[in-house]
Amino acid sequence: MGKTPDWSRLEAYAGSMSKAEFEQAWQQIYSEKNGLPPPFKFTDTHLEVPTGQLAKTTCRIPFRADKEASTSDQKPSWRRARDLPPLEERPPLSDLHIALDPGHIGGSWAMMEERFLSFKPGEDIREGDLSLLTAKILKERLVKEGAIVSLVRESLDPVTTKRPADFEAESRKVLTDAGFPTPAASYQGLTGDAKLLTVQWQSEKLFYRVSEIHARGERVNQQIKPDVVLCLHFNAESWGDATSPQFSPKNHLHVLVNGCYSPGELQQQDVRFEMLLRLLSRVHEEEIPLATTVAESMARVTRLPAYLYSTPNARQAGSNPYVYARNLLANRLYECPVVYLEPFVMNHEETYHRLRGQHFLGRTLIGGKLVTSAIEDYVNGIVRGLLSYYQTNRPS
């Protein structure tokens, strides 16, 4: 479902980056930590990328010599902190355009998304609802600090105009190509892997995991054009059977930036193009320090420990234990710095009850303990992190 790349967009970065800069970004951020060689090559003079297209099989981007000035006039649509206008005693986030992307959809779609959690009849939490509430409260706080704020999703409705039924043909092809030529149409009464091997499940996945994110990408890149996107999520640990979920003793926080591409992912021409577009536009130079500052603030406010990845699909980005590089569709498609937040474990018992309380100020009694609102902590952590970063790095 990806778009056919316009390789001329990469060629516009000719002479903008030295080989040393490219190699450092590739080795420290965009590649797997101990990954195999990528499906492109770079020499002392240029980067050479197979396009996967017959009309033009290779895209060639010259490097600039180490001591030469950049010969590219290519400018991204987003602005670094240092490129914002001087504050001149205005509110600290003045001129900064922030897009808030509330994760998932919520509402009646939450069960389909598998982001619906209930430990007792008549009560539940839905990640899409919680992320939208967090975004609306966060928007109010950021606007008070002078920011221009846009919501990527403004309601409990999908951004995409497509629906699961629109993907039945693609789903049948996916299953047929995988060796299942006669898949069941519905997963009614099925569980586990049997559920995954149905046209219904595959169609729903293409709807909410792929089509929805592509629609948000179009909105971000073509309409909003922000300086930064904050993707707001809540984490979860495995809770077992959805009809009889289990609480988890774990509660943690981590923040993601884009990176850590596997050679298999880069075999896809759209993924290869999107990764190189981010690398050559130097989005990581703003994204990682911004994410690090926000992560430090979130850690102070929430007092959550850092999540530890044990799988190869993520790697630490810099020295902060809370910040990881990972290749996700949202943080790859959005053509600007993206800070992707994953605080709190929804099926941690105290967190579950804090989130059921929605948003409140001060402290309230939960489980015999006075606690703050998890959403209020989430919002405060982000606001303090953004204030710290932009007050330090933009012209005064």
Which residue ranges define each predicted feature?
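Solvent-exposed, acidic/flexible segments
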Residues: 15, 91, 124-135, 206-214, ...
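Non-catalytic propeptide/linker segments at domain boundaries
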Residues: 2-103, 109, 164, 173
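Active-site histidine-acidic residue metal-binding/catalytic motifs
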Residues: 84-219, 238, 248-252, 259, ...
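Surface-exposed patches in mature extracellular/periplasmic domains of secreted proteins
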Residues: 145-156, 207, 229-233, 302-316, ...
